[in-house]
Amino acid sequence: MAMASATATLSFKTPSLSLSPPSTRCSAAQGISLTHFNKQLKSTLNLSSSSSISSSKVQPIVLKNKRISTVDSSVSTSSPSFTVFAAKGYKMKTHKASAKRFRVTGKGKIVRRRAGKQHLLAKKNTKRKNRLSKLIQVDRSDYDNVIGALPYLKVNRKV
């Protein structure tokens, strides 16, 4: 039985802003015109699951024809990016009857008991009963079925 899982990745880049020297002062009477800035910003922002928010064409904020802040292009290219991972997967359930029948050795092999040692033991000789008591390795062709029933089994397929 196969279960579905999905992974979403979002990446955000934060540009660093450097302010110009405080040679220009802003008073409460002066107004800031942001209409051109907002239109330019809306047209340059892109957001999707595979790309990051980018605003490379941002114009500086203008105060009545006076520049007070600019975007430093050399610093913004080396700005840190923050990545958010959202992974959703379903827990696989262990098949409890299979968990009682199979074991994993220290090297990662799947082993099982031999059949035929539950009843009618009086007619079986001692040598046969001893042989049936030992564990044997599961065939490689059955590994997929056992691992499907026991998803959290630590199996080494290369051994």
UniProtKB/Swiss-Prot annotation:
A GO cellular component annotation in the UniProt record: large ribosomal subunit
InterPro entries noted in UniProt: Ribosomal_bL35, Ribosomal_bL35-like, Ribosomal_bL35_CS, Ribosomal_bL35_sf
Transit peptide location on this chain: 1-86
Keyword Disulfide bond tagged: no
Compartments reported by the entry: Plastid, Chloroplast
Biological-process GO terms, alphabetical: translation
GO terms, molecular function: structural constituent of ribosome
Pfam family, one: Ribosomal_L35p
Main location: plastid
UniProt keyword list: Chloroplast, Plastid, Ribonucleoprotein, Ribosomal protein, Transit peptide
Its biological purpose: Component of the chloroplast ribosome (chloro-ribosome), a dedicated translation machinery responsible for the synthesis of chloroplast genome-encoded proteins, including proteins of the transcription and translation machinery and components of the photosynthetic apparatus.
Family: Belongs to the bacterial ribosomal protein bL35 family.
Complex formation: Component of the chloroplast large ribosomal subunit (LSU). Mature 70S chloroplast ribosomes of higher plants consist of a small (30S) and a large (50S) subunit. The 30S small subunit contains 1 molecule of ribosomal RNA (16S rRNA) and 24 different proteins. The 50S large subunit contains 3 rRNA molecules (23S, 5S and 4.5S rRNA) and 33 different proteins.
Protein name per UniProt: Large ribosomal subunit protein bL35c
Lineage: Eukaryota, Viridiplantae, Streptophyta, Embryophyta, Tracheophyta
The encoding gene: RPL35
